[in-house]
């Protein structure tokens, strides 16, 4: 997106974006470029990768770009200059890294795109991610099931939100969701009162919750003064919380105004709490522990001169090449299964969700 709940703005601003590298004597250092600390998800990713790489005997050089493209470019260039052996990059903007990746290639450094595909470069060696199309399918199925569309119920009003247009995953999420929702839209069982469809209309730059909240405010005032929105496709928990804030601000969730079905992604704690409270309807769980393991396995293979295991060699065309990829399976989470998936699975402790 990889897929954003956001931390408070004050906390995000207050966190230093430089993380001192930790070095191992034997195996060399792996550079890890993460996009932001303004999302709990990316903090978890960074911690999981560092923990597993260090356990495998590697030094780690973890940097967060603070959603600042030039900052991330500078960080990656420094990793190349310092001679990091492999780069693991979750790009802020997947289209901006071509020049620095050419330098990495010239220096013999392998590059793994981490959960966000790096585009327009032939120097992306592997991609570790989840089945992003399936993420969208699961989100849409949550809406279909929640509304009872398969039972012939409807019509219902729905509004659509997409992720950041500079994140390749956002298009997979949206396309996956629309593969399920479009037949219901075409038949009139789902009605997009705003008429806003397509990533050019519904995308949310940088996955920004405030932008999503402002757009939901505008949709409600322009199209729903005398109508009820029944569902909102949201691709990410951070957006979902902003959308729900907008809805609650005009009375949804009180009196006779039922909250619409609102989807999400990343199983961030505020959204899981919202699901438990009966507000957000669902989220998608992407186990970053497993993604870190796949990434470390790729690093090990590359450092040993072997070919990393992949599961997909056809889907992820970055505009220059089809990048060999390992796709993990996402899991839909709602009030009925969050304990089994998130608590019993060891991702969260029960008291974290209280």
From Swiss-Prot:
BP GO terms, sorted: chemotaxis
Subcellular localization: Periplasm
Pfam family, one: Peripla_BP_4
Record key words, sorted: Chemotaxis, Crown gall tumor, Periplasm, Signal
Gene3D superfamilies reported in the protein's UniProt record: 3.40.50.2300
GO CC terms: outer membrane-bounded periplasmic space
Single Gene Ontology MF annotation: carbohydrate binding
Signal sequence coordinates: 1-25
InterPro entries: Bact_Solute-Bind_Prot2 (IPR050555), ChvE-like (IPR049784), Peripla_BP_I (IPR028082), SBP_2_dom (IPR025997)
Protein role: Required for effective transcriptional induction of the vir genes by monosaccharides in response to plant signals and for normal growth and chemotaxis towards certain sugars. Functions as a periplasmic multiple sugar-binding receptor protein. It does not interact with a transport system.
PANTHER family: D-XYLOSE-BINDING PERIPLASMIC PROTEIN (PTHR30036:SF1)
Family membership: Belongs to the bacterial solute-binding protein 2 family.
Protein name: Multiple sugar-binding periplasmic receptor ChvE
Organism: Rhizobium radiobacter (Agrobacterium tumefaciens)
Gene: chvE
């Amino acid at each position: 997106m990889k897929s954003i709940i956001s931390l408070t703005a004050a906390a995000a601003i207050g966190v230093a974006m430089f993380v001192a590298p930790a070095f191992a004597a034997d195996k060399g250092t792996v550079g890890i470029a993460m996009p932001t600390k303004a999302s709990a998800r990316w903090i978890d990713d960074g911690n999981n990768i560092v923990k597993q790489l260090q356990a495998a005997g590697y030094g780690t050089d973890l940097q967060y770009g603070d959603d600042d493209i030039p900052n991330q470019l500078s960080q990656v260039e420094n990793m190349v200059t310092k001679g990091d052996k492999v780069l693991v990059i979750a790009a802020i903007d997947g289209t901006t890294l071509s020049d620095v990746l050419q330098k990495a290639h010239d220096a013999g450094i392998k590059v793994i795109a981490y959960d966000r595909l790096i585009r327009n470069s032939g120097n992306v060696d592997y991609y570790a991610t989840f089945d992003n199309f399936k993420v969208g399918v699961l989100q849409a199925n949550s809406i279909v099931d929640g509304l009872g569309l398969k039972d012939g119920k409807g019509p219902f009003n729905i509004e659509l939100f997409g992720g950041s247009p500079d994140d390749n995953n956002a298009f997979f999420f949206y396309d996956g969701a629309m593969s399920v929702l479009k037949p219901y839209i075409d038949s009139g069982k789902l009605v997009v009162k705003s008429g806003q469809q397509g990533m050019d209309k519904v995308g949310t730059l940088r996955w920004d919750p405030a932008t999503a909240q402002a757009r939901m405010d505008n949709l409600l005032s322009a199209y729903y003064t005398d109508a009820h929105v029944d569902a909102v496709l949201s691709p990410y928990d951070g957006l979902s919380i902003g959308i729900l804030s907008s809805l609650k601000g005009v009375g949804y969730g009180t009196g006779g105004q039922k909250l619409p079905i609102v989807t999400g992604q990343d199983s961030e704690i505020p959204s899981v709490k919202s699901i438990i409270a009966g507000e957000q309807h669902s989220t998608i769980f992407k186990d970053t522990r497993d993604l870190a393991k796949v990434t470390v396995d790729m690093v090990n293979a590359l450092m040993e001169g072997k070919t990393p295991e992949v599961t997909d060699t056809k889907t992820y065309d970055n505009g220059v090449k089809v990048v060999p990829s390992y796709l993990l399976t996402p899991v839909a989470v709602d009030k009925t299964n969050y304990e089994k998936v998130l608590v019993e699975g060891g991702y969260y402790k029960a008291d974290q969700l209280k």
